[in-house]
Amino acid sequence: TDTRRSNRSRLLQSIITRGPATRAELSRRLGLSRPTVSVIVNELLGVGVITEGDRVSSGGAPGTLLEISKRTGVIVVADLRSADIVRLSTISASGELVTTDEAPASGTDQVQSAVTAFIDRCEPQSVIGVVLCVAGLVTRGEWDGEGERDGRALALGLRRALRLPVFAVNAAEATAVADLRDSPGDVAMATVLLDHQVAMALILDGRLLSGVTRRTGDIAHIVAGTPGPVCDECGHMCLQQQLLALRTDPATATLLDAAHALAAVLAPIAAGVELTEVVLSGFPDAVADELAGLTHRSLRTRMLDEHVPAVRVSKRGPSAAMIGAAALMLYRLLG
């Protein structure tokens, strides 16, 4: 039935994005009865999609962890956020980084050659899909491209050459999915990602929100009203310029201005969608923790105390986007 398919999909999504769990934990996460969870689990065990792992106890009767089968294979992630380099990784079904490499590649053909050569050096028979991790808008797994890279031609060329599924995902959204493993169960989370630009992704009630004509978290050029450098692109002292300045000038005044700007942009979003957590990813290690604390304090001056979300630094490191991208691809293949 549709309900059973939906519950199966939700259960797989939970294991893929939030990590291994016992039957009891899955019942709590999904709000499903124990018998319903057991029926779905037995079906997935029977077809080899999931396997039973270690027995764990959280104070009650021990339970057995359920995880995605290691026999599922690996996913190749091509990080295309740099205009002239492609960073490549293989990620296991359990979300572990297996191998990494990078190659100079600016145009479509160069990227395709780099990806196919990387797969040839790995174990090609173990690869179950390729995901393109990009900074731009992704619509139903397709990316138009940017600069010298034609996203649709690249995906089509890789599908033909490799005979594998190839999809694109937005890097901020992928990072948010990776960060979800470290968040509480009932979470409304915003991940703010700083790399070549500023982007945000939203996860509400376990669901990733995606934009229609632009990225959901397109907050880069919002003007917060705090002093900062003028942006060449929009001509204003926008949030993106204030946060990018932290990479070259981590002075206290710059950090405080950045925190106030970030809080000014996040406060109405937090109030509007009941955010419980903000995660900062990609910020310089030297300032990330202090920025999180200052942003939280600034939010408290703009909102009711009971509405202020927690602000923390991502624990996933520079590989977060790749790990999250692989999780999104795996869910697309199995869910």
Regions from the PLM with identified roles:
Residues 83-85, 137-139, 198-199:
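Short, acidic Gly/Pro/Ser/Thr-rich loop/turn segments
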Residues 134, 194-196, 277, 282-283:
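Short secondary-structure boundary segments
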Residues 100, 148-149, 157-255:
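Glycine/GP-enriched mid-protein hinge/lid loop-to-helix segment characteristic of carbohydrate kinases
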